From Swiss-Prot:
Belongs to the class-II pyridoxal-phosphate-dependent aminotransferase family. Histidinol-phosphate aminotransferase subfamily. CDD domains: AAT_like. This is Histidinol-phosphate aminotransferase 2. It comes from Nitrosomonas europaea (strain ATCC 19718 / CIP 103999 / KCTC 2705 / NBRC 14298). HAMAP family: HisC_aminotrans_2 (MF_01023). GO terms for molecular function: histidinol-phosphate transaminase activity; pyridoxal phosphate binding. PANTHER family: HISTIDINOL-PHOSPHATE AMINOTRANSFERASE, HISTIDINOL-PHOSPHATE AMINOTRANSFERASE 2.
Amino acid sequence: MMNLSELAPDYIRAIQPYQPGKPISELVRDLGLNKDEVVKLASNENPLGTSPLAKEAMIQALNESARYPDGSGFELKAALSERLGMPADQIVLGNGSNDVLELATRIFLHPDSTAIYSQYAFAIYPLLAQAVGARGIAVPARNYGHDLEAMLAAVTPETRIIFIANPNNPTGTLCDARDLLRFMERVPQDVLVILDEAYDEYLPEANKANSIAWLKNFQNLVITRTFSKAYGLASVRVGFALAHADIANLMNRIRQPFNVNSIGLAAAQAALKDVEFVKLAYMTNRTGMQQMTHGLDQLGIEYIPSFGNFVCCHIDGHPANTLKIYRNLLQQGVIVRPLGNYDMLNHLRVTIGIEEENKRFLQALEQALKELD
């Protein structure tokens, strides 16, 4: 009997599925733990939950569940246009920012092309390139971040996309705005630069690149953002891209007709209005980062200075020690993110939680380190 999977292209069959952070429900099933006692610090979610305004909007949107959503996302795009100072025809909505990343990839990459990203880039980038048969080029990192000069040097006539996450996930590093602007000025105009700003809301104003203003001068720039992080809407999947009108038009042509659901549209529009909630998320993260890094210092654990809502910890010794620590934390009801799929075998990524969650992690880590000895 024919194995139909063999008819798929080799590059599709070679794909390794993306591994998300372990869900709380899975840990409860596996270890029989009480759900309320589990602390999840694995997926860079907002520990404050969701904006009250967004919650109310979602409840109201449920009344229209039998209706298809507005496929154009007119009202959300209008709200984003007003907030960001961008024409609505330069905004593309997506089912999370991963969706708009994939749209750009499908348009510009093909089996004879290449995509460039950093060694420790978001794991989705190489998957997106592989899914269309393009060749991914991982440029060696510089201090766990982007080496922009090396990325420029890696550009060839076959290069169609360069991915840059700023701040970077999973390392939390940040490219200086001036360096990024000089980079954009030197990138060939026929190479699309995708600037993934999923964690932009966690940056102090002094560190923000003001990249939206660059769109006027660089037609080859696409900026992606999400409502999953600071806005606390990870489960309803809403993201967006900002691009030159011609590129946005192409992205809108190939996206699914109703790629953002009604509940997500309503929640995102309401969340945009809740400025105080986002400010609180920012301040909670700053305070939590100080608590977390102070605790790691006390334990003698090295970490990568982070501009996101997470911190990347280094566990000394053989990589097996890192897995032992990870599993021990699970036994204690604390979920963090191992980074073996990033070839960071001695690292764990930890989301910044509220004070009690951070304390719980640090106590569990201290216990795990003792048991490792």
